[in-house]
Amino acid sequence: MAALRVQPEAQAKVDVFREDLCTKTENLLGSYFPKKISELDAFLKEPALNEANLSNLKAPLDIPVPDPVKEKEKEERKKQQEKEDKDEKKKGEDEDKGPPCGPVNCNEKIVVLLQRLKPEIKDVIEQLNLVTTWLQLQIPRIEDGNNFGVAVQEKVFELMTALHTKLEGFHTQISKYFSERGDAVAKAAKQPHVGDYRQLVHELDEAEYRDIRLMVMEIRNAYAVLYDIILKNFEKLKKPRGETKGMIY
């Protein structure tokens, strides 16, 4: 089979990209990763992430508890109105109205923390993607013998893949919190006499607070693990067979 012919100018563009990627990776390891480890460690020590009494996180839930007598009278009037009113359209419009309590806001304390956390999630995933691409471009052509360095590359790549999967899950976790909290608030508004629904809203807030702290820890740890394992194996990762440069297989 004839060898693939690559135009010199095309190869030059790939080489420029490769060199730029190597420079960025070395800058990440040399300064950016240590800086992020320090910043996230400081974030974890802030009072905002060290609330001992989680009941302080409780957000106002402006859903009035109904008076049983008034509710009974209201229900009777509603039944009478439905008997008299045969207009299905009007009935449908009434059913679409929101709860009498008005809008219920998010938990501002949780939202403020998430506004700080989400850029960190985006950043660590992007940096991990960059370093993973750099590593893949160091993998040499497949051939027999002297594959210890390649095995090291594969182990590090497996670690990076696992980290990426975990970090990507944080976005879903945050969305799930808002979805579940919204459902709990809707149930509390629809059945305001059920105290469990009210308490469920507060329980979800407390659980999310704990998760936010854990996510910050995981991001810090991701930077630390990447920094440590790449630094310890840098020569093997960059030159698995002692070659001057890696080749894409």
From Swiss-Prot:
<dbReference type="InterPro" id="IPR036252">
    <property type="entry name" value="Proteasome_activ_sf"/>
</dbReference>
<dbReference type="Pfam" id="PF02252">
    <property type="entry name" value="PA28_C"/>
</dbReference>
<dbReference type="InterPro" id="IPR003185">
    <property type="entry name" value="Proteasome_activ_PA28_N"/>
</dbReference>
<dbReference type="GO" id="GO:0061133">
    <property type="term" value="F:endopeptidase activator activity"/>
</dbReference>
<dbReference type="InterPro" id="IPR036996">
    <property type="entry name" value="PA28_N_sf"/>
</dbReference>
<feature type="compositionally biased region" description="Basic and acidic residues">
    <location>
        <begin position="68"/>
        <end position="98"/>
    </location>
</feature>
<dbReference type="GO" id="GO:0061136">
    <property type="term" value="P:regulation of proteasomal protein catabolic process"/>
</dbReference>
<feature type="region of interest" description="Disordered">
    <location>
        <begin position="60"/>
        <end position="102"/>
    </location>
</feature>
<dbReference type="InterPro" id="IPR009077">
    <property type="entry name" value="Proteasome_activ_PA28"/>
</dbReference>
<dbReference type="GO" id="GO:0005737">
    <property type="term" value="C:cytoplasm"/>
</dbReference>
<dbReference type="GO" id="GO:2000045">
    <property type="term" value="P:regulation of G1/S transition of mitotic cell cycle"/>
</dbReference>
<comment type="function">
    <text>Implicated in immunoproteasome assembly and required for efficient antigen processing. The PA28 activator complex enhances the generation of class I binding peptides by altering the cleavage pattern of the proteasome.</text>
</comment>
<dbReference type="GO" id="GO:0008537">
    <property type="term" value="C:proteasome activator complex"/>
</dbReference>
<dbReference type="InterPro" id="IPR036997">
    <property type="entry name" value="PA28_C_sf"/>
</dbReference>
<comment type="similarity">
    <text>Belongs to the PA28 family.</text>
</comment>
<comment type="subunit">
    <text>Heterodimer of PSME1 and PSME2, which forms a hexameric ring. PSME1 can form homoheptamers.</text>
</comment>
<keyword id="KW-0647">Proteasome</keyword>
<protein>
    <recommendedName>
        <fullName>Proteasome activator complex subunit 1</fullName>
    </recommendedName>
</protein>
<dbReference type="Pfam" id="PF02251">
    <property type="entry name" value="PA28_N"/>
</dbReference>
<dbReference type="InterPro" id="IPR003186">
    <property type="entry name" value="PA28_C"/>
</dbReference>
<dbReference type="GO" id="GO:0005654">
    <property type="term" value="C:nucleoplasm"/>
</dbReference>
